[in-house]
Amino acid sequence: MKANYKITKLLGEGSFGKAYLATVDNEDKKYVIKQVIMDGMTDQEKRETFNEAAILKRLDHPNIIKFKEVFRQSQPKEALNIVTEYADGGDLEQKIEAQKKKPFPETQILDYFTQICLALQHLHKKHIIHRDLKGGNVFLMQSGLVKLGDFGIAKGLKTSKEKAKTTVGTPYYLSPEIINNKPYDTKSDIWSLGILLYQMMTFKMPFNAQSLPLLSIKINRGVYSPPPSVYSAELRDILKRCLSQDPEKRPSIKLLMIFYNCLLLRIELITS
């Protein structure tokens, strides 16, 4: 670990490493150091680790966790340390859990939703698929900013026509094309965005099962309980479009932003 970083807290740990909260000498800011232990990794796992750092370096957007630096260490074990800004408001998964079944106001959902869309818009313009969009990877700042993070399995494509093939992601958020081992593109992120939107509207998953085979069946059927009618028909329509079985029928991020602006205008007209 670099001498100028002072570790203040262990934030979490996984199979390949740990995440620490740290401060830097003569700075007011807090940082997260994701330390990935590379001893025992396969070549593919090492490539994925370097890939996360490489993608973070390419990204500069207010709604994406800001990259500070990356450095390697050889003692006591070979490790790669990825340093990013710290989100002081927790994550969206924690926020949904803390809401304790009290419905989010539609304006709050739209605020979160549009900021996630802006982050995805930046990614998709660079032909990057996040591939693990979920509440635990959407970080909140006390200022109200929403920041997309954790690019451990993100995939950079060479062109907008190229598709990814690897089956990766969190099961409940997997799109039908990934479940069925078909090539996929940025529209797979739109599906995951729809799952997250449904969570914010209902506090549950649209497709739930105790095993991956059963979950796959439910995702392929595409049948889910409708969200509460307290939310506008326009918001429910956005959800329906995001969860289209056919990726070609899902809106692009650009089109989603148009839907959002129309919905925002409607709310302003009603409340004025």
Where are these regions (language model features)?
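Regulatory alphaC helix of protein kinase catalytic domains
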Residues: 49, 53-54
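Conserved catalytic-loop aspartate of Hanks-type protein kinases
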Residues: 189
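Conserved N-lobe ATP-binding subsite of Hanks-type protein kinase domains
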Residues: 18
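Short beta-strand micro-motifs within the conserved protein kinase catalytic domain, predominantly
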Residues: 66-77
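Activation segment signature within eukaryotic-like protein kinase domains
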Residues: 112-113
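A conserved loop-to-beta-strand element in the N-lobe of protein kinase catalytic cores
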Residues: 75-85, 93-94
